[in-house]
């Protein structure tokens, strides 16, 4: 029996196709055209990616001009109202308010500086203002003994008495945080704000009592942060009636008693919102309003404040820069003297 010999397995051999690279110079005409088309296509794609990465702000700054109608430009300014450039304006707190009121007392003499040792809120300002004006009335008629006269810690009783006698304009500042719904909660919130060093939602508003003009003026740089103007007017009308009884009009013996005890006039000075969102300038705006009032009690706020937000900001920045140095003389918080 013969041995069986299996044939060797057949193998398949694959050969790679050879690729020949030719330079652009040696390539055929069709290859050159193809390469040019591919290069142009890649350039277009690259330019598209660059334009996609180009920010909209850069496109606005590009060297070209477009004619836009006045309505579109107005809308753009309205949008920019919330985007104000420049360094932040300094925050004026109660110490700055006191220093500025001392500066105004030195200039106008009829102004009583702001007592910052007794914090006022929307819960106690009516009673406090009435008590302050009643104290002035009793001092004028020599009914208050020196020992009974309450005066701020940084002012002597003798000096405080003289200031009360010579003052006819009484500015008061109220501190407010919308999260507090009682006087105790408001004072607690005030302590927390002072400890943290952050402004938070706190806000200053101004009340001016003018005995000579028989007027109570309220100012809120946010216009309606504490309450609506109508709600504030209703509260202030109660104060105005009390002040009318404390300081009756001068008249003869035959004058009508009801007319003599007529209430003070109530004026809501914050007719527009002057403080821009994101800025903590309520204290500085209160001081600016007080300065305008002392120059002319009948001034119109809308005539003083520009409608353009950038111009408003520049106006307040100029006011701050021109008064801060003069205010520094009262940095010790000592009350000015009448000598």
Curated annotation (Swiss-Prot):
EC number: 3.4.22.-
Homology family: Belongs to the peptidase C48 family.
Transmembrane segments: 36-56
Name of the molecule in the record: Deubiquitinase and deneddylase Dub2
InterPro entries linked to this entry: Papain-like_cys_pep_sf, Peptidase_C48_C
Top-level taxonomic group: Bacteria
Gene: cdu2
Coiled coil segments of this chain: none
Enzyme class at the top of the EC tree: hydrolase
Pfam families: Peptidase_C48
Organism: Chlamydia trachomatis serovar D (strain ATCC VR-885 / DSM 19411 / UW-3/Cx)
Membrane topology: Single-pass membrane protein
One annotated GO molecular function: deNEDDylase activity
């Amino acid at each position: 029996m013969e041995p069986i010999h299996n044939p060797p397995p057949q193998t398949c051999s694959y050969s790679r196709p050879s690729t020949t690279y030719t330079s652009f110079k040696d390539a055929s005409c069709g290859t050159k055209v193809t390469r040019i088309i591919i290069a142009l296509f890649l350039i277009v794609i690259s330019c598209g990616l660059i334009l996609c990465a180009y920010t909209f702000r850069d496109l606005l700054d590009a060297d070209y001009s477009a004619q836009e109608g006045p309505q579109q430009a107005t809308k753009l300014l309205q949008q920019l109202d919330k985007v104000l450039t420049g360094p932040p304006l300094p925050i004026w707190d109660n110490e700055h308010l006191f220093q500025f009121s001392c500066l105004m007392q030195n200039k106008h003499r009829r102004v009583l500086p702001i007592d910052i040792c007794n914090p006022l809120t929307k819960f106690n300002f009516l009673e406090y203002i009435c008590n302050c004006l009643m104290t002035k009335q009793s001092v004028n008629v020599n009914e208050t003994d020196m020992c009974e006269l309450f005066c701020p810690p940084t002012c002597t009783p003798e000096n405080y008495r003289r200031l009360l006698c010579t003052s006819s304009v009484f500015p008061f500042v109220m501190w407010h945080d919308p999260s507090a719904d009682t006087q105790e909660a408001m004072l607690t919130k005030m302590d927390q704000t002072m400890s943290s060093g952050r402004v938070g939602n706190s806000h200053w508003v101004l009340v001016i009592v003018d005995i000579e003009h028989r007027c109570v003026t309220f100012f809120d740089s946010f216009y309606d942060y504490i309450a609506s103007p109508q709600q504030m007017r209703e509260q202030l009308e109660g104060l105005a009636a009390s002040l009318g009884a404390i300081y009756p009009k001068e008249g003869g013996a035959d004058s009508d008693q009801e007319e003599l005890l007529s209430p003070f006039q109530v004026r809501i000075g914050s007719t527009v919102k002057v403080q821009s969102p994101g800025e903590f300038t309520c204290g500085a705006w209160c001081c600016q309003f007080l300065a305008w009032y002392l120059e002319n009690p009948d001034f119109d706020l809308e005539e003083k404040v520009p409608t353009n937000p950038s111009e408003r900001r520049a106006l307040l920045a100029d006011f701050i820069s021109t008064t801060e140095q003069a205010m520094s003389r009262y940095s010790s918080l000592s009350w000015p003297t009448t000598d």
